[in-house]
């Protein structure tokens, strides 16, 4: 509409239904913009739905031709990405201000056990035990570089004085070169089983050694999952 022609937009990747994204990256091919970048962003945000906001725009990097002179592909929002980072939010205190973006559990979890279990995720492994059936990935091998649980204080609690005890809010962070369909939600569901004491810390490693999706924990709600960063 703003450019006067149909534009094909390509995103950094797909997420499960109900999952949120911050700092999501996409690209499109176009002639030079007819507006200043800030004005273009303003006009875009004026016509986009309230649930979508554009924060920046810039020209994609020029492709670097290899020293051997072989073909170098243009920059691509999805295929040029080298890492993706997700966050999953859980709270243990009833909180109507965060309900839309965090999963409320009535009983606390053992973060120390869950963090020790995270060690099995680090490195290059077959994560098919956490992949939802029907995925069309050519391989289930992913390389995880970070996985951890930690407590945090949400903004409304620190700024507005909403009651908040130590450990009432926790977040899981995981970063990898790629992810399988439903992978993060299945990992979190399995971690919760460990945090509740229903499974040993070694369970994650055992699942990855030969378990199937039906052996792992349940898929947790998508509303509390955020694609938070795409690395290039």
What is the predicted role of each segment?
Residues 1-232:
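Structured-RNA-binding interfaces characteristic of tRNA pseudouridine synthases
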């Amino acid at each position: 509409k703003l450019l006067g022609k149909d534009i094909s937009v390509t995103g950094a990747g797909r997420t499960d239904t109900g999952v949120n994204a911050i700092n999501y990256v996409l690209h499109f091919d176009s002639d030079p913009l007819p507006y200043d970048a800030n004005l273009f962003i303003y006009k875009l945000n004026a016509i986009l739905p309230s649930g979508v906001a554009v924060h920046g725009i810039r020209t994609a990097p020029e492709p670097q031709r290899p020293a051997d002179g072989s073909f170098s592909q243009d920059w691509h929002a999805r295929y040029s990405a080298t890492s993706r980072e997700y966050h999953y939010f859980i709270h243990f205190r009833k909180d109507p201000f965060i309900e839309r973006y965090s999963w409320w559990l009535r009983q606390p979890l053992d973060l120390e056990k869950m963090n020790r279990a995270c060690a099995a995720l680090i490195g290059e492994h077959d994560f098919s035990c956490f992949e939802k059936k029907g995925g069309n990935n050519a391989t289930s091998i992913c390389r995880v570089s970070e996985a951890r649980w930690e407590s945090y204080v949400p903004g409304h609690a620190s700024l507005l004085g909403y009651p908040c005890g130590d450990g009432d809010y926790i977040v899981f962070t995981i970063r990898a070169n790629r992810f399988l369909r439903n992978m993060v939600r299945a990992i979190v569901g399995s971690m919760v089983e460990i945090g509740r004491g229903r499974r040993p810390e070694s369970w994650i490693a055992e699942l990855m050694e030969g378990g199937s999706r039906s052996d792992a924990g349940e898929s947790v709600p998508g509303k509390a999952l955020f694609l938070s960063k795409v690395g290039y």
